[in-house]
Amino acid sequence: QTCALPILVGNCEYGLLLYRDKLPKFNNDGRMIFNCFDWVLDNETPKVHSTQKPVPLLRRLIEIFTDKGDVVIDPCAGSGSTLLAAAQLGRRAYGFEIKKKFFADANKFVLSRIQQSLFQ
């Protein structure tokens, strides 16, 4: 028997910005981001992970909070989208993923797109 009850799905996600010693950078042309900002879903990029974030969204966040040459760390790399976005922006990126299948899928996902961007 199937359940007819509605399933609730969250309509937002939270992010953490970790920094050491001094306040984080904020490269947003003087505009504030108060509690949230809207983003259009990315339905074009193939999904390799159930909680995969859109690369354009991650690129925007990385642009705001880092400069070229900075390091971006993703402790739960999943699809590798954060690593791809960081590489596209000239940041060094390190990701960690405990699940071997996700690691393998993310590795293919990121490397194929980095190689595409090198030859375009």
Regions found by a protein language model. Name each.
Residues 118-120:
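Acidic, low-complexity intrinsically disordered tails
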Residues 1-95, 99-103:
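Core catalytic lobe of class I
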Residues 106-107:
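Conserved SAM-binding loop
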Residues 114:
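Short, flexible loop motifs at catalytic/binding sites
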Residues 110:
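Conserved hydrophobic residues forming the short capping helix/wall of the S-adenosyl-L-methionine
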